[in-house]
UniProtKB/Swiss-Prot annotation:
This is Large ribosomal subunit protein uL29. One of its GO terms (biological process) is translation. Pfam families: Ribosomal_L29. The keyword Ribosomal protein applies. It comes from Lacticaseibacillus paracasei (strain ATCC 334 / BCRC 17002 / CCUG 31169 / CIP 107868 / KCTC 3260 / NRRL B-441).
Length: 64
C-alpha cells in the first residue's frame, strides 16, 4: 500500500487497516516459526505498511 493510498483513507479506516496488518504480521510470524512461510518478503512488506500508516496518522495529528 502506497502512502498516497493511505492518505486517501479516513482515520477510522487507517486504524482498521493497521489492525488488519498487525493480525497478518502475527500470523506470518507463526508461519515462519513453523516453517510454513513461503514468501518471507511479505513480513517486511507488512511491517513497512504498518509504519506508513502510523506515519500518516502522526502527521495528521501534528497538523491539527
Amino acid at each position: 500500500m502506497k502512502a498516497k493510498e493511505i492518505t486517501a483513507l479516513t482515520t477510522a479506516e487507517m486504524l482498521d487497516k493497521e489492525k488488519q496488518y498487525k493480525e497478518e504480521l502475527f500470523n506470518l510470524r507463526f508461519q515462519q516459526a513453523t516453517g510454513q512461510l513461503e514468501n518471507t518478503a511479505r513480513l517486511s512488506q507488512v511491517r513497512k505498511n504498518i509504519a506508513r500508516i502510523k506515519t500518516v496518522l502522526r502527521q495528521q495529528a501534528l497538523n491539527k
